[in-house]
Amino acid sequence: MTDLHGNRIKRDGTADLLKGFAVLFMIQVHLMEQFVSPDIYSSLIGKTSMFLGGPFCAPVFLAVMGYFLAYSSKPLFYFLKRGVLLFLGGILLNTARSANLLIQIIQGKLELDPWFYILGADILTLAGLSLLLTGIMRIMFREKAWLYAISAIIVAAISPLLNRAGSTGLFPSHFRAFLWGTEAWSYFPVFPWFAYVLAGYSFRLFLKQSPVAMKIDIQTRIIYFIPAWIGVIITIPFASAITHNLDGPDGYYHHGILFFGWVLLFLLSYLVVVKLIEINCGENRILGFVKWIGQKVTMLYIIQWLIIGNLATWLFHSQGLFQFIGWFFLVTIATILTGLLVDKIRLP
């Protein structure tokens, strides 16, 4: 296994499972957002779908990304170069997944702002900016885990303040959306989402600098996290209300420190559960396939968006429950088969 920078790292089955499950949850939530009719979206099924596509997805991707960035020994220039490439790749993906829609805009069939779709602040653009920022912070903070942890808290805490501050002359709205703000095309801005990268980064450094923590057996961890699980379960209604409301100053995309804290508690509890699954069932064939999905997360993320994004031009908010289920299986199978084909072509 290699990290984002080509450094050799021993394959982590738990991380692969986390990412694999996240991809599956991600596909269904994108279908719920794009395809499903408003009445289904507003139902308990819709709220459940959005919750599964909330803390189980983006925070997992970003925290795992931060965790493995802490392994990297690459210089700043590599972080900057990789960050720029990822950011530009995100813009290219925005364009490609909206190709059907953009063609109709060009043809005059739809009167929409094309930049809304091309300059959407999504996960890939966030990953690129996160690499840039992390590369710079590594020079200043070195391996001081507490500085990354405090920075994560600050990023999450000031996000609502930045959103309320609104526009500045330095950053026009289309570009400010990548950093902060509640514009409709600002899905994953740096504030607050970079906080999860920093949380994962600091978590890895804490473990590295506290060998005792790594030696705690899974049974002891389960006992420690029983109160955390209880707290997470009791407060699911609070979290679900946020994950079901995507936009606006109090929505999922622009949440503040309270939801960030809840997600961290959830991630730690969820990590213990997935670690337990890996220890007891890690050799299972189905879970092995989920791990493969996790290993190919970036490629599968791109493929599923190319499929869903272009179909959404025709199917936007028009599908019922059974159609949603059908589309989930179809898109998931198509994504995986395409990924297998691409993987085979890429092999020497």
Can you say where each PLM-predicted feature lies in the sequence?
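Alpha-helical transmembrane segments and their immediate juxtamembrane cytosolic regions
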Residues: 1-348
